[in-house]
Amino acid sequence: LSAIKVITDHGAELGLPPMSLEKVTGLFQTNQQSVSNCDKANVKLGFGTDLLGDFHKYQNDEFVYRAELQKNIDVLRSATSVNADIIQKTGELGCIKENALADIILVAGNPLQDINLLSKPGENISMIMRDGKIVKNQL
């Protein structure tokens, strides 16, 4: 959703011609409805964006947009264990257990109650551990 939102909000900056900008009008709402329909039908929904360059800063807005349509726990699962399941890496990724690859983060608050915390990682994530090594520590 965040990639579509960037295209609809910043398409002109991206160099999209007027005809393309017209085509994307309403696309965000259409995609929201698709996510909602999939959620209601218990379709596995992975989590991720393809935002690069100047627009990379908007990628974590996906948490906010998805939480408007799904429960916070389902959005978090989508970003972790569901993604692992989709790429057939259950037990290796998306979980915290011995011999699993995991990024562990320390969040200033409870994303189950306020998922918006994850939309601003620079402000709300004070520690990141990757492969057993701390790669960010602002404690």
Positions of PLM-derived features:
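Short, Lys/Arg- and Gly-enriched loop/turn segments at beta-strand edges
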Residues: 111-117
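Phosphate/diphosphate-binding loops
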Residues: 125
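Short aromatic-centered micro-motifs
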Residues: 128
